[in-house]
Amino acid sequence: MSSAPAQGPAPASLTLWDEEDFQGRRCRLLSDCANIGERGGLRRVRSVKVENGAWVAFEYPDFQGQQFILEKGDYPRWSAWSGSAGHHSDQLLSFRPVLCANHSDSRVTLFEGENFQGCKFELNDDYPSLPSMGWASKDVGSLKVSSGAWVAYQYPGYRGYQYVLERDHHSGEFRNYSEFGTQAHTGQLQSIRRVQH
């Protein structure tokens, strides 16, 4: 009796449209795209369909500005990717796949101070409210992603600015809040969850 060869996960892919509700011109991505205007010919992205994998979208070219996690599914307009974020962004201009998301084996350690100093707490599950689980501060000074990929949020309930934190970026070591993302002006993180791949 022979068995089928083991198959890895399907390659990451998503389709972008320049109008809401999957209308207008479209472009399909299978890898990083630093500027959708140059590579895909779209001036803006107003709706997204993620076929495989998880992606990080950025509001500006060259992976700059606010980050938005895009997991498998449909995003017919900006409110679908912004969620309950206090930040309105109706444009996405650069994209990259999240390559290290493994929901079953994700681990991150939060530190109160910069450079992995002070009180610490290790997580391997989703936390809609870090203060409710005993994290005394509204800020996280630094963190280490041991495995997987995480999305941290500015406020409880997975609201506010999003920061995608991966083992494969910065070797999983984020020494201070400015390394969380280009839009990080504070270390305020109050909820965190594993990226769904």
Swiss-Prot record:
N-terminal arm: annotated span = 1-11
UniProt GO MF annotations = structural constituent of eye lens
**Keywords assigned:** Eye lens protein, Repeat
One GO biological process term is: visual perception
InterPro entries in the cross-refs: Beta/Gamma-Crystallin, Beta/gamma_crystallin, G_crystallin-like
Q: Which SUPFAM superfamilies match?
A: gamma-Crystallin-like
Lipoprotein in keyword set: no
Q: Does the keyword Cell cycle apply?
A: no
Chain segments carrying region Connecting peptide:
100-105
A Pfam family that the UniProt record links to this protein: Crystall
Q: Which residues cross the membrane?
A: none
Domain Beta/gamma crystallin 'Greek key': from-to ranges: 12-52, 53-99, 106-147, 148-196
User: What domain of life is recorded for the organism?
Assistant: Eukaryota
Similarity section:
Belongs to the beta/gamma-crystallin family.
Q: What does this protein do?
A: Crystallins are the dominant structural components of the vertebrate eye lens.
Assembly and interactions?
Answer: Homo/heterodimer, or complexes of higher-order. The structure of beta-crystallin oligomers seems to be stabilized through interactions between the N-terminal arms.
Q: What is known of its domains?
A: Has a two-domain beta-structure, folded into four very similar Greek key motifs.
Q: What is this protein called?
A: Beta-crystallin A2
Could you tell me the gene encoding this protein?
A: CRYBA2
